[in-house]
Amino acid sequence: MTDLTSLTIAEARAKLSAKEITAVELTDAYLGAIEAANETINAYVAVTPEKAREMAKASDARIAAGNAAALEGIPLGIKDLFGTEGIHTQACSHILDGFEPRYESTVTQNLWNDGAVMLGKLNMDEFAMGSSNETSYYGPVKNPWRAKGSNLDLVPGGSSGGSAAAVAARLCAGATATDTGGSIRQPAAFTGTVGIKPTYGRCSRWGVVAFASSLDQAGPIARDVRDAAILLKSMASIDPKDTTSVDLPVPDYEAAIGQSIKGMRIGIPKEYRVDGMPEDIEALWQQGIAWLRDAGAEIVDISLPHTKYALPAYYIVAPAEASSNLARYDGVRYGLRVDGKDIIDMYEKTRAAGFGQEVKRRIMIGTYVLSAGYYDAYYLRAQKVRTLIKRDFELAFQAGVDAILTPATPSSAFGIADEDLASDPVKMYLNDIFTVTVNMAGLPGIAVPGGLDRKGLPLGLQLIGKPFEEETLFKTAHVIEQAAGRFTASKWW
């Protein structure tokens, strides 16, 4: 019998429907894989075997009764940012020590309503602040990929590193993730998986721990494009509890898979050619262009002139919002509390002990740019730049471009505890150079594996679409996937 953990969601769905396997068997296969590998990979910060088996049994009963829902019996991993009722939800931060919410996030509730099974909570950068999953209170996640002939442990990307590593190492059928500046697309690119950041407002933010509220968006990481489409259909919904949720029906994304892209116009932005970009990345981009041209798409050069300002503007806007959002963690109602001589002392000691170094850095930056003397010079100017970035994309789309193709990341995965990056936070921030524009403009973006670099590590291509045209991204990404093939890490763990 095939190893059940090697099945895609679509394949598992077919076998469950045909009663060739049961949801309990599938869930047990994943729980066994987690038990064997998690000590090494560190993808999960909490595993919920009893809950998983109980949900799988209920799925088997519904399948037997002919009442199977869209994700019936499919075992998923949930990023630790999503509120899961009565289960560890700590945003991988010490300050939320012991926190178990009394509510369920809208996205996870949608998944459970569609019959999905929860395997546990996935590791991530603390409060989703990071590009390498090294800022987690629970330690770094190891990428299931290694360079040819090397034993060096690599990062899986961030902040959704646990989600990407778990999918790549087959420790779940698919995973939820979030993306504020690239936190779905960059880890997907580093691990040879598919990740989509939907349009801002497509998935509810209710019950998801906030980082930067005007940028945060939930989405799936999956093994292939079809699985990502299946997951997004279940995750997305209109939600009156989230004021930024957009009242548009959720299409059947899976129906877009396999559609022709003949006649589509694909924009290639000249500003994405950055100094020092590895030859492998440039070659992959050219290969992606050739694949889409061969499939009948028209390739057009475009300009997004304000791209160069996106990263500095992002690292003003996001920390400013984080500084406001994270002010609520004070040790009074929940999470960690460090006693002090008075309430102010208690606040200071709790926050000093509870937040990690990178989170403290971003709170400090955010508080600084919002302070009276600097608000106009930094925050207001960054918001104006954001408007210009959005306008660049609008003009490109108005000129007839259907989607935009770029590299997903400026490099392949790098080593854990890389000294060069550890000593210079700005170098780490540069990992987001190709992804932040999409969040600043609120657009959908998908990362799809395009090939391996000369070290044998996966590289991703990014497609950027018009607002709420995720179907265009899925059908175009599927063309790339068909041409490039799928990539699986050789097991060393």
UniProtKB/Swiss-Prot annotation:
SUPFAM superfamilies: Amidase signature (AS) enzymes (SSF75304)
Keyword Ligase: yes
Annotated signal peptide: none
EC number, UniProt record: 6.3.5.7
InterPro entries (UniProt xref): Amidase, Amidase_CS, Amidase_dom, AS_sf, GatA
UniProt keyword annotation of ATP-binding present: yes
Active site: K79, S159, S183
Alphabetically ordered keywords of this record: ATP-binding, Ligase, Nucleotide-binding, Protein biosynthesis
Pfam families registered for this protein in UniProt: Amidase
A GO CC term attached to the entry: glutamyl-tRNA(Gln) amidotransferase complex
GO MF annotations, alphabetized: ATP binding; glutaminyl-tRNA synthase (glutamine-hydrolyzing) activity
Biological-process GO terms, alphabetical: translation
Domain of life: Bacteria
Catalytic activity entry: L-glutamyl-tRNA(Gln) + L-glutamine + ATP + H2O = L-glutaminyl-tRNA(Gln) + L-glutamate + ADP + phosphate + H(+)
Task of the protein: Allows the formation of correctly charged Gln-tRNA(Gln) through the transamidation of misacylated Glu-tRNA(Gln) in organisms which lack glutaminyl-tRNA synthetase. The reaction takes place in the presence of glutamine and ATP through an activated gamma-phospho-Glu-tRNA(Gln).
Assembly behavior: Heterotrimer of A, B and C subunits.
Family: Belongs to the amidase family. GatA subfamily.
Name by which UniProt lists this protein: Glutamyl-tRNA(Gln) amidotransferase subunit A
